[in-house]
């Protein structure tokens, strides 16, 4: 029995001596070094000795390492995101194109246009998206557009509840690498493809400091280049030249509403009371005089939508005129069909874009649509209607002549 005890004692004291004899000293030294290093690092940072100029090139290999890490992070954090079945719907692509032209092209370029010298003077530089989007799947793109990227000029989506808007941007981004300048111009601005001026101007390189920094295929030092522009009054890209909407688009027909309603809606978008990252960007750039001018320009014109009417729906007509009393749903026409009653609060629905109406129903049902002014029972109403009933109401109102009594 003595031998096993001696062996155990050797294991305990010889090979693995007591903690305070072997590890305590080195642990104290390591802790001291860590604290000292942290203090020195904080002192150096606070002193201003380290400069962060965008005019200097990034260290060799840093940009590639950061981009690879960013792509891996986006894939990891987006793997559980559900992709909508209608991701490639034309109306999504069109809406995304208009928003991209307004908000993103100035930094990332666009089909037919390179990147401006101002954007390419950032560090890190924004990539030329038509050339690099193939590295990202739909889920990764959604995560990036919705969340942005820290320590870059890439913002998060301003309205986090509007995932539907983000998916429209993703729908466009997935198709952009395959677009030429003519198709892009038609989608983004509403200009007929045959009149797209940019298509007649082939891209040519321009000289820029550090143009050889990093992989050139990820950036576009070419003219014509996308420019920073104001979104003030930029209505036609989504709503069409006359405000009645665009064929196959999802933006609403503005001409159905009164100037009062349009002005109040722009105010609600600007304040965030009615969440929409797309509309808020435009609305906050408008002065009160701009809002008054735009409301007067589009309001009460009642122009038929370019896509024509859709077939009516008997169930929708019955709900619009009678409601669903058994579930406490009042007739839609009790608010929306009374001319002159609260023009700021109750929009006209007859002849409205069916895609827009369906989307608004979904937003009300999800509790994220917001409101313009005053009393708003729509969240409760949409909860009490089945999806089939909501779709029927949409078909009914979309089938009516523009501006008719609902």
Predicted regions and their residues:
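Acidic, glycine/polar-enriched metal-coordinating patches/loops
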Residues: 1
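Periplasmic c-type cytochrome electron-transfer domains
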Residues: 4-98, 106, 110, 117-118, ...
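Periplasmic/extracellular electron-transfer cofactor-ligation site
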Residues: 97, 101-124, 150-153, 179-180, ...
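Extended intrinsically disordered, low-complexity coil regions enriched in Ser, Thr, Gly, Ala
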Residues: 123, 257-280, 309, 350-375, ...
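Soluble periplasmic/extracytoplasmic beta-strand elements of cell-envelope proteins
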Residues: 128-130
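Glycine-rich, acidic and aromatic/proline-enriched surface loops and short helix-turn segments
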Residues: 147
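Generic hydrophobic alpha-helical scaffold/packing signal
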Residues: 266, 280-283, 295, 317-320, ...
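Long, contiguous C-terminal modules that act as interaction/assembly or targeting platforms
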Residues: 359, 363, 370-376, 384-406
């Amino acid at each position: 029995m003595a031998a096993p005890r001696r062996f155990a004692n050797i294991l305990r004291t010889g090979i693995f001596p007591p903690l305070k004899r072997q590890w305590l000293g080195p642990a104290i030294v390591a802790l001291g070094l860590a604290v000292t290093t942290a203090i020195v690092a904080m002192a150096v940072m606070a002193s201003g000795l380290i400069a962060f100029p965008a005019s200097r090139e990034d260290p060799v290999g840093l940009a590639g390492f950061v981009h690879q890490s960013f792509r891996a992070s986006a894939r990891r954090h987006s793997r559980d995101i559900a992709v909508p079945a209608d991701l490639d719907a034309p109306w999504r692509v069109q809406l995304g194109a208009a928003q991209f032209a307004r908000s993103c092209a100035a930094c990332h370029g666009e089909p037919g246009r390179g990147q401006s010298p101002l954007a390419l003077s950032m560090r890190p530089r924004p990539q030329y998206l038509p050339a690099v989007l193939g590295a990202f799947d739909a889920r990764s793109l959604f995560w990036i557009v919705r969340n942005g990227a820290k320590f870059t000029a890439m913002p998060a989506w301003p309205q986090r509840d509007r995932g539907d808007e983000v998916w429209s941007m993703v729908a466009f981004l997935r198709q952009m690498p395959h677009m030429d300048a003519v198709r892009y111009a038609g989608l983004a601005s509403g200009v007929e493809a045959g009149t797209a001026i940019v298509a007649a101007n082939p891209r040519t390189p321009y000289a820029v400091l550090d143009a050889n920094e990093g992989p050139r295929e990820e950036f576009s030092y070419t003219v014509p280049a996308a420019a920073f522009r104001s979104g003030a009054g930029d209505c036609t890209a989504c709503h069409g030249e006359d405000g009645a909407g665009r064929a196959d688009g999802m933006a609403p027909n503005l001409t159905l509403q009164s100037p009062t309603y349009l002005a109040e809606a722009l105010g609600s978008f600007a304040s965030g009371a009615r969440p929409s990252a797309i509309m808020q960007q435009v609305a906050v750039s408008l002065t009160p005089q701009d809002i008054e001018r735009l409301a007067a320009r589009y309001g009460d014109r009642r122009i038929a939508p370019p896509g024509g009417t859709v077939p009516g729906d008997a169930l929708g007509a019955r709900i619009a005129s009678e409601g669903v009393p058994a579930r406490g749903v009042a007739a839609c026409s009790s608010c929306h069909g009374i001319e002159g009653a609260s023009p700021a609060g109750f929009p006209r629905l007859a002849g409205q874009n069916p895609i827009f109406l369906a989307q608004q129903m979904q937003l009300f049902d999800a509790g994220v649509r917001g409101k313009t002014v005053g009393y708003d029972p729509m969240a409760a109403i949409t909860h009490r209607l089945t999806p089939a009933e909501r779709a029927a109401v949409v078909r009914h109102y979309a089938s009516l002549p523009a501006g008719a009594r609902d």
